[in-house]
């Protein structure tokens, strides 16, 4: 039984015997029987920090070899079998690894005698219920890239693993009749066993299908020697692990993995358990996919008979609106797992893989209108510039706006899009390598790959440089503006401080000063009016005094002249009463004096008016123009 589970595989040019225990691979080198101590500690279910400490101490005690380059699964600390047995006894896993330690490889079938399983015909029942398929030119199953754990991976080993994976992938032939090489032959166990109608298969089907069966069959735990845990239990070649994974049955999955179930076993359509579980929503309903994907993550890099990866199947699930959220849930978890365990280039090539119709997972999502799934793929290095065999692009079904995250989206994936786009700009060669890995569909696609895209990247690089120069110039202008602003703020603060000192922080200082000034102006105007009044009074008094004085003088002289005239007239009358002309002369003299008096009064009035005007001008000059304004307002009112 154990011999059937031990397989000879070549990693980085080194042949090893591989034995899967509880979902973890354990390797023993064929040429020296050394074992991978790192994998033994993983089987003991120790976390990475503890494994690291144990291996550091263990390596100091004896012979060992650390492998960091090459294939990821082959990496780790290798020790002789004696030291491996010692380590296994220390952590109570010797019983689990004993079959591989005792295995000599003598009963192992030469790989050259393996027959490619794609030539095996399905059963009659399967052929009756299956649609007619075209002949597939790829091997029976395709492990696109050897799954690598991120635990012991460095940047150097990651790149080495990529080259090994690409070289292994190039070894796949396009003819199903070509004998399998060391890589394809080593995956002989991946193909599901033929359909079996024995009691084991029927019991497993009853467990999965009948509602009243809640406990796994006893033989799952007892593991009888005649039970093949990787055998197909239905007419489609599904193994028990396929069923358990699709139904989200974690208890059964753990039991099957403990029994040695192969994570990468496939059905007749070369579909793995991981592919089958994303075709249904049970793991979404139970929220168990995160655990299931961890258990089945070794199969994340595989594709089926139609060239479709697990991401293609999730995209197909998104064709139903009722299953859209489940598809997004599956897509998010698997993309996180893929990018956490694989390098950027390998992850991008797996995500952008085309099926037999040339469809990528992104194109299928776009065709189904699954915007959220498309956004997730774009945030994890998916390319929207890969057409299918009909020349269709994802942008033919969804606009760029539909496939971009909203600006107000606070999702962490929103910020990751920008980082991934920057990575794509920094490493455009990876995209060009992917596009050139397949034969161009037409002359135009070849021209696009080798001429247009490099020009686009060149233009983008120049645009980036121009943007950086413009940004530097704007930054300099901004710095100068900030310095000027800081200087202005400092001056403003100084002025404010001086003002506060002058006003004693009185907010009504200006109002109070204005009111005081108005009060002083009114007081000054009142003083001017009083001065004018007194000046007018004094001048009027003096004028009256002068008028009275001159009037008295005038009246006395006139009366004297009249008296003298009368005396003369009376004397003449007495002496010569015949002389009448003297009286007429007296009347003429009196009239002339009256006219002169009136003329003097007019001149006096004119002088009085001029005097008042001069006084007003003097007062207005002293009051800076306010006196006339106030007098005008008062006269108008």
Swiss-Prot record:
Biological process GO annotation list?
A: positive regulation of DNA-templated transcription; positive regulation of transcription by RNA polymerase II; regulation of transcription by RNA polymerase II
Ranges for region Disordered:
114-137
Annotated ANK repeats reside at 236-265, 357-386
Q: Does the keyword Ubl conjugation apply?
A: no
- Per its UniProt record, what InterPro entries does this chain match? Ankyrin_rpt, Ankyrin_rpt-contain_sf, HTH_APSES_sf, KilA/APSES_HTH, SWI6-like, Tscrpt_reg_HTH_APSES-type
Residue ranges of DNA binding? 37-58
**Complex and partners:** DSC1 contains cdc10 and sct1/res1.
What PANTHER family has UniProt attached to this entry?
Answer: ASPARAGINASE (PTHR43828), CELL DIVISION CYCLE-RELATED PROTEIN RES1_SCT1 (PTHR43828:SF16)
Q: What is this protein called?
A: Cell division cycle-related protein res1/sct1
Organism from which the protein derives: Schizosaccharomyces pombe (strain 972 / ATCC 24843) (Fission yeast)
